[in-house]
């Protein structure tokens, strides 16, 4: 493919509106362009990468018997009313009317559509299991699109749905998908973890997320590719290294999720779902009487603890939430933070949001900073974290502005239901007791769910079992964020290319090292002087030999300065660069392996053989 015939609009500078490196590079390298807020055009390079990823997916899904199809993106609202999600999905749902004023939506996901199709076609257990998937654009009305392809209003997704007679059968397919996802992301060259996840608006009982790990910005060895003029990192002057560190630190750490994982075992979970080992620390002690004490201007845990000269963990943190329009108190020890997802899941709620101060005054008679669980009116549900039950003679708000109670004791002074509703902390013991929890940022690239009968119950998707009884179909759901993969790959494979000029000056510039299976082309063939006929003839011969051996070749035939060509090549990020320069008359070409920065000159007749040797382990 001739580069002069492709739309690859590279930029000399990073785009000013980009905050994460993947967004900046995919724009600067000419992979995507924003059409409007949260809506992107995938230019030829991005399209080729996405198509290669689709091929990997199809190959792995063929192995587990998944069958591809295509459902409409424009959906009738009646389907979503039938499942109950039309009202509960929230403001992210694109709603529209046709000329007859009938309600439609643009599909953010397709559980209802697939459930209906199977419900209408499948009547007997003998027709199951079914394993269907599609790859298409989805739509969500994001309030604040950001970070390139990570948070958009239109995005490409692979969503699959499986249909079963039993949960045992679902378990088999669920595990097959888990293994397929691991194979797909491994082939795509991603560093990822499969973690315990939250089902969210999808419903269901079990789920696993697949997270691409955001690289550590402090590890220079994994970010820098050194030119052959620089033997090692130790040869770079300290002031240059400090500049490079500052450049790395100037980009936001990508990834909307924090992952908690064990330092010694396979345990890993989204922070929203993560737990740590819990050991009861309750002690037998004499219980003090309740005493109301004035605590002027003390509204935070640390202010109250300092005023009363107690440890922060002895102060009960009281938070008021409105849960499905009813008040719920959540209690924590003072130095812990609430995990709203855990609380919502414990309550089985559709909606959960912090109460306003006005609501707190109307319900409890006091403002924030003075709320507590003692002497409440009947009907207010209290959920306390497990650690609260270990407290004795604690401090809590008195539900009276500027006052707190001392001598507060769970079970004597208030009744609560206990659950794990706290956010874990780095360094705590893993729940499997192997290692301690460590944190990392990650980009969600896949999610699998055991939906169970969530949709078949609400949409009457039943089959007849062996005994002729009508039973609901058991479902699974399996998603991959296809367009997100491009961001995740670039985030992990962005590099700073460092070189040294003949005068001894150090230069560094951003580029991409695409993994072989996802690179839009295998080889970037660059002719330094396109006006040199011998160089042109050699270019055509090399191009033909590469293509004959199955290499996808992007030939830079533009009449541009060689510096611009090399700069664009680093940005675009193909695994191999072959340069035809001053030694074209001798038949000599230069091979450069982008991942390592290594280069070698060989005769054109030995090019294929040399490439086979250089790339056999890559």
Swiss-Prot record:
EC number: 6.1.1.15
Compartments (UniProt record): Cytoplasm
Keyword match Nucleotide-binding: yes
Any Pfam family hit: tRNA_edit
GO BP: prolyl-tRNA aminoacylation
Domain of life of the native organism: Bacteria
Matches recorded under PROSITE patterns: AA_TRNA_LIGASE_II
Keywords: Aminoacyl-tRNA synthetase, ATP-binding, Cytoplasm, Ligase, Nucleotide-binding, Protein biosynthesis
UniProt cross-references to InterPro entries, sorted A to Z: aa-tRNA-synt_IIb (IPR002314), aa-tRNA-synth_II (IPR006195), aa-tRNA-synth_II/BPL/LPL (IPR045864), Anticodon-bd (IPR004154), Anticodon-bd_dom_sf (IPR036621), Pro-tRNA-ligase_IIa (IPR002316), Pro-tRNA-synth_IIa_bac-type (IPR004500), Pro-tRNA-Synthase_IIa_type1 (IPR023717)
UniProt keyword rRNA-binding, yes or no: no
Catalyzed chemical reaction(s): tRNA(Pro) + L-proline + ATP = L-prolyl-tRNA(Pro) + AMP + diphosphate
GO molecular function, one term: transferase activity
Any single GO CC term annotated in Swiss-Prot or TrEMBL for this entry: cytosol
Quaternary assembly: Homodimer.
Family annotation (PANTHER family): MITOCHONDRIAL RIBOSOME PROTEIN L39/PROLYL-TRNA LIGASE FAMILY MEMBER (PTHR42753), PROLINE--TRNA LIGASE (PTHR42753:SF2)
Domain comment in the entry: Consists of three domains: the N-terminal catalytic domain, the editing domain and the C-terminal anticodon-binding domain.
The family this protein is said to belong to: Belongs to the class-II aminoacyl-tRNA synthetase family. ProS type 1 subfamily.
Annotated function: Catalyzes the attachment of proline to tRNA(Pro) in a two-step reaction: proline is first activated by ATP to form Pro-AMP and then transferred to the acceptor end of tRNA(Pro). As ProRS can inadvertently accommodate and process non-cognate amino acids such as alanine and cysteine, to avoid such errors it has two additional distinct editing activities against alanine. One activity is designated as 'pretransfer' editing and involves the tRNA(Pro)-independent hydrolysis of activated Ala-AMP.
Name of this chain's protein: Proline--tRNA ligase
Lineage: Bacteria, Bacillati, Bacillota, Bacilli, Lactobacillales
